[in-house]
């Protein structure tokens, strides 16, 4: 009886390793939800990008749901999602932009070319805010409630499908 129990920890460990390997093979960055969901958003630590002051912690706690979008001029998926961000802005959604690991000239050139969907924005060239928020790459978007709590994280571009399935229900207050 003792010999079969001796192998139980090994089997349990093999199960965890197998589950982890399977999860990594899914290639869906959203399969791993943020540990910040339901918690207060980390501090906003940004440098100015252009003449305007960057957004602040107070901007995330003004009673309105907002998107916090991490992006970069060198990021191809950021170009893909950009028209959808412009559409959200036109729908009245406030989007706070965080230019991540980029240069001011390139970031401003990107916005001059593509248009700016951002209500307010700032730069995070040293990845200080990105580390606090758990950003692994761009684009990455967080939905933040009016009290400054993170509702969800979306890794990858905001496609029409992602907006319909993940963002619209949160904005309407009908998400699970």
Swiss-Prot record:
Disulfide bonds: 75-78
Family recorded in the similarity comment: Belongs to the thioredoxin family. DsbE subfamily.
Protein name per its UniProtKB record: Thiol:disulfide interchange protein HelX
GO MF term set: disulfide oxidoreductase activity
Database matches in Pfam families: Redoxin (PF08534)
GO BP term, pick one: cytochrome complex assembly
SUPFAM superfamilies reported for this sequence: Thioredoxin-like
Keywords for this protein: Cytochrome c-type biogenesis, Disulfide bond, Periplasm, Redox-active center, Signal
Organism: Rhodobacter capsulatus (strain ATCC BAA-309 / NBRC 16581 / SB1003)
Subcellular localization(s) per the UniProt record: Periplasm
Principal location listed in the UniProt entry: periplasm
Disulfide bond as UniProt keyword: yes
InterPro entries, per the entry: Periplasmic_diS_OxRdtase_DsbE (IPR004799), Redoxin (IPR013740), Thioredoxin-like_sf (IPR036249), Thioredoxin_CS (IPR017937), Thioredoxin_domain (IPR013766), Thioredoxin_ResA/DsbE_sf (IPR050553)
Gene name of the record: helX
Record GO cellular component, one term: outer membrane-bounded periplasmic space
Protein purpose: Required for disulfide bond formation in some periplasmic proteins. Also acts as a disulfide oxidoreductase in cytochromes c biogenesis. The cysteines of apocytochromes c must be in the reduced state for covalent linkage between the two moieties to occur.
Domain Thioredoxin: from-to ranges: 35-172
């Amino acid at each position: 009886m003792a010999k079969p129990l001796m192998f139980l920890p090994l089997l349990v460990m093999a199960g965890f390793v197998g589950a982890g390997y399977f999860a990594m093979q899914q290639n869906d960055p959203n399969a791993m939800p943020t540990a910040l969901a339901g918690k207060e958003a980390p501090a906003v630590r940004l440098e100015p990008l252009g003449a305007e002051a960057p957004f602040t912690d107070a901007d995330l706690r003004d009673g309105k749901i907002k998107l916090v979008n991490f992006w970069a001029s060198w990021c191809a998926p950021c170009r893909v999602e950009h028209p959808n961000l412009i559409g959200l802005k036109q729908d009245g959604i406030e989007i706070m932009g965080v230019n991540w690991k980029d240069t001011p000239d390139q970031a401003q050139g990107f916005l001059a070319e593509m248009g700016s969907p951002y209500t307010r924005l700032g730069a995070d060239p040293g990845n200080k805010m990105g580390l606090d928020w758990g950003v692994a790459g761009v684009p990455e978007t967080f939905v933040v409630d009016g009290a400054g709590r993170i509702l969800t994280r979306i890794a990858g571009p905001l496609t029409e499908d992602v907006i319909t399935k993940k963002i619209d229900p949160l904005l309407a207050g009908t998400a699970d």
